[in-house]
Amino acid sequence: MAVISKKIPAPDKVEIKTALLSVFDKTGIVELAQALSERGVRLLSTGGTYKAIAAAGLAVTDVSDITGFPEIMDGRVKTLHPTVHGGLLAIRDDNEHQEAMKKHGIEGIDLAVINLYPFEEVRAAGGDYPTTVENIDIGGPAMIRASAKNHAYVTILTDPNDYAEFKEQLSADAGKTAYAFRQRMAAKAYARTAAYDAAISNWFAEALSIDTPRHRVIGGVLKEEMRYGENPHQRAAFYVTGEKRPGVSTAVLLQGKQLSYNNINDTDAAYELVAEFLPERAPACAIIKHANPCGVATGSSLIEAYQRALACDSVSAFGGIIALNQILDAETAEEIVKLFTEVIIAPDVTEEAKAIVARKPNLRLLSAGGLPDPRVAGLTAKTVSGGLLVQSRDNGMVEDLELKVVTRRAPTGQELEDMKFAFKVGKHVKSNAVVYAKDGQTAGIGAGQMSRVDSARIAALKAEEAAKALGLAVPMTKGSAVASEAFLPFADGLLSMIAAGATAVIQPGGSMRDQEVIDAANEHGIAMVFTGMRHFRH
């Protein structure tokens, strides 16, 4: 394959003599122009940026004056011109390039300050199709890429947060920038245009209902660098995609240390789970460890929901994540701080509750600003060696399913409610998952076992331990409903559930031995329903 090959010398220091400024986000642009003007730098600009700089009383030249071509088509064409791109792309130490510049009257541009139309913001706000398309920047990305390619000679700034460092460089080096800085800004510039194009590509895929586009690009903006990943020897960082889904990526950290990799992973799992329970129906609480629930409950009040969730497995809840579906109040906060907890996340937090949690300065308190809608799918992704698995989020809701009673005995009204509750929780438990529930409270949770029978046994054992801790004569699995997130392949799993005291079972169905399982349920007088929907989670 033929490739383009050209050695380009890279001078360490390049003096800024001419700058092109063309930005949508005008944060700090006048101050930057002022600093450049004071150093005698010639300023070129366009449109609104030109007006802002001129209004500040600074000498600035409109790009159309150097191109000899006016801005046309509502600003769609203004910098797409050889005079501009030649000035950005010319190799200063190449004689042919220099001759071409002289012949065509092209002036070298040493600094480009460019940022883009707010496509991502318009998309996130739900802009209509024509408006969103109109906010796709063309000239901006072209100038950014040209400047970044020629970073041996040109400094490119795409982020107002870099203006201060740039000005420090000029002050420290007599108006010059170092190659290492230009190189770093070029890398950042290409990352910016890549993310911008990814957002556009993904929006088109969504708008046209293309589930599996030929090229899938998932981009993000660095939110924070972490001390380490899942384990201390692993490096990690947190990137946000811009999806406006309330949760750990949008939450405000009201107090506490920086969230760790594991904190973020577990908090996301906890908040997505608790959002399954609509706040207008009842307060709900989910307590999570290692992305699996220790306990989940609803209650007549938020504090009761927390207490009931904690009762399911108070030992495992130590050092866990607490997610609430309603505003954290003082009474609930007072109860929570009695137990060592890593993170609390809620839609919001009262001032009184903040003051109470402040007594535990290491406890991380997050206000998410709302609850995620469990019915909205979006995308989830998982890396594998050399690839990326992408799927829609599991937005299946048991309320939307047509439940099929497959046994002679139909569930009672209370059993049906407990079935639905358990199945909701089971959706968020690592497979194989078995969840016992009674009266809007988990009684026992079995997670992540290779055998479904083992998950059922572990859940029953957890229920027995909880009963002893609470001084109960019998575990809460007695008279409970039990959910399996996938079908029961044999009757042994059902028999284990019956032995634990369950009187009603909810499962997807679909096994070759469904009838065997149904017969066993009928033999023991158990009610069982099929959902027709599986909730594997890995």
Swiss-Prot record:
TM segment ranges: none
Entry keyword annotation includes Disulfide bond: no
Membership in a protein family: Belongs to the PurH family.
InterPro entries: AICAR_Tfase_dup_dom_sf, Cytidine_deaminase-like, MGS-like_dom, MGS-like_dom_sf, PurH-like
Official protein name in the record: Bifunctional purine biosynthesis protein PurH
PANTHER family: BIFUNCTIONAL PURINE BIOSYNTHESIS PROTEIN ATIC, BIFUNCTIONAL PURINE BIOSYNTHESIS PROTEIN PURH
BP-aspect Gene Ontology terms: 'de novo' IMP biosynthetic process
Gene source species: Rhizobium etli (strain ATCC 51251 / DSM 11541 / JCM 21823 / NBRC 15573 / CFN 42)
Keywords assigned: Hydrolase, Multifunctional enzyme, Purine biosynthesis, Transferase
GO cellular component, one term: cytosol
Domain-level remarks: The IMP cyclohydrolase activity resides in the N-terminal region.
Pathway(s): Purine metabolism; IMP biosynthesis via de novo pathway; 5-formamido-1-(5-phospho-D-ribosyl)imidazole-4-carboxamide from 5-amino-1-(5-phospho-D-ribosyl)imidazole-4-carboxamide (10-formyl THF route): step 1/1; Purine metabolism; IMP biosynthesis via de novo pathway; IMP from 5-formamido-1-(5-phospho-D-ribosyl)imidazole-4-carboxamide: step 1/1
MF annotations from Gene Ontology: IMP cyclohydrolase activity; phosphoribosylaminoimidazolecarboxamide formyltransferase activity
Catalytic activity: (6R)-10-formyltetrahydrofolate + 5-amino-1-(5-phospho-beta-D-ribosyl)imidazole-4-carboxamide = 5-formamido-1-(5-phospho-D-ribosyl)imidazole-4-carboxamide + (6S)-5,6,7,8-tetrahydrofolate; IMP + H2O = 5-formamido-1-(5-phospho-D-ribosyl)imidazole-4-carboxamide
EC number: 2.1.2.3, 3.5.4.10
Highest taxon listed in the record's lineage: Bacteria
Record domain MGS-like: where: 8-158
Pfam family name, one: AICARFT_IMPCHas
